[in-house]
Structure formats: structure tokens, C-alpha cells
Amino acid sequence: MDIMKDKIRQALSELDILATEVQIDQWLDYLKLLEKWNKVYNMTAIKNIDEMLVKHLFDSLAVAKYIKGDSTVDVGTGGGLPGVVLAILYPQHQFTLVDSVGKKIMFLKNVKKSLSLNNINPLNTRIENLEGNFDNIISRAFSSVDTFYELCKHFLTEHNQMLAMKGRDLEERNLESLPLNIEKYSIKVPFLNAERNLIVMRKKL
């Protein structure tokens, strides 16, 4: 476990993120819960906690600096990625975690209770049925960018942003068709030898 903590500290340093030992313990406790539930409920395709550390925890932390304001909705959150990871980092920020799969929301309610994460609100619903105001609308491995936009455009205002976490495929053709201001960022994930990108979309003024 100390080796994993050291790896987290190194990743935080590379990402220029300040975190406490309590937060590091919370991230590890979260991953242990995810690994435990995964054996029964198939929460994620990644089974190994060491692999989860990089492909889930560090991948989620790599977009932390792009989160603005004080509220975020995580669309198709699955096992709570990136929402739970970011909620631990930003305890004053409210995260609404949305998924249509009941067992995943059941898991997230367990995470909320076990880790005393009062700034997450897991909701078992479809995103198109949700109403509310959020500073960030984020998705990771949820859908194509154009589908993400179509399902979430009712949240978009002049003051917030949509963030799509992507791999190598930036879906350039889909992006060109969207009536949005679009910025693309190459994301460096510590200990991961794979291309990761973030697409930030805002309403045209």
C-alpha cells in the first residue's frame, strides 16, 4: 500500500496537484471498494487495482485543472469516474453523478456513505431527463461527442462548459458539425503510455 501511495504522490507532483494524506487514503479506499464490487457486479473492465490506479485515478485527476466553478454533472458516471475522484480532490465542489444502471448508483451510494463524501449526489436516471444548472458537464467513455452534445445541450448556457474525455479518436468530423466553440487539449496521464485528450465545448456567444 505504501508503494501505491508513493505512486499517487508522484502522479500528483507531475500533475501539479496539491492533496492531503487524507485525500490519498480516500482515493485508495475508493479503488478498493471498486475492486471489491467489481468481482460481483462488473463495474469496470479493469479488474486489477494497480491498473485502476493509472487508468482510472490518474486519468481522472489529469483533467482536474479544467474543472471550473462549484458544480459538475458527471454523465454516464459508471463506477464514479471521473466524478468520485474529483469530488475527493474538491470537497467544496458539488458533483451530481448520473447513470441509468441501478447497480452502479447503488455502488456510488455505498461509496458516499463509506467515504463520507457529502459532495456527491448519485442519481439513477437518464441524463436527458435531468434538469439543473451546472458549471461543468463532463463525460468519460460515455458516447460519441455529438451524442453527448445532443443529450446534454439543455444544460448549456453562456457561462458553463461541456468536457469530453477521449482517447486517440477526436471525432474531428463530428466536432465540425457542432454549433459550439471547441478547444482540444492533449492530456498527459502519469504512468500511462497512451494518447488521452480533452475536448472542451462552450456555447457560441
From Swiss-Prot:
The keyword Transferase applies. GO terms for molecular function: rRNA (guanine-N7-)-methyltransferase activity. S-adenosyl-L-methionine binds at G76, L81, I127, E128, R140. It catalyses: guanosine(527) in 16S rRNA + S-adenosyl-L-methionine = N(7)-methylguanosine(527) in 16S rRNA + S-adenosyl-L-homocysteine. The keyword Methyltransferase applies. Pfam families: GidB. It is an enzyme of class 2 (transferase). SUPFAM superfamilies: S-adenosyl-L-methionine-dependent methyltransferases. Its main location: cytoplasm. Its EC number is 2.1.1.170. Specifically methylates the N7 position of guanine in position 527 of 16S rRNA. Belongs to the methyltransferase superfamily. RNA methyltransferase RsmG family. This is Ribosomal RNA small subunit methyltransferase G.
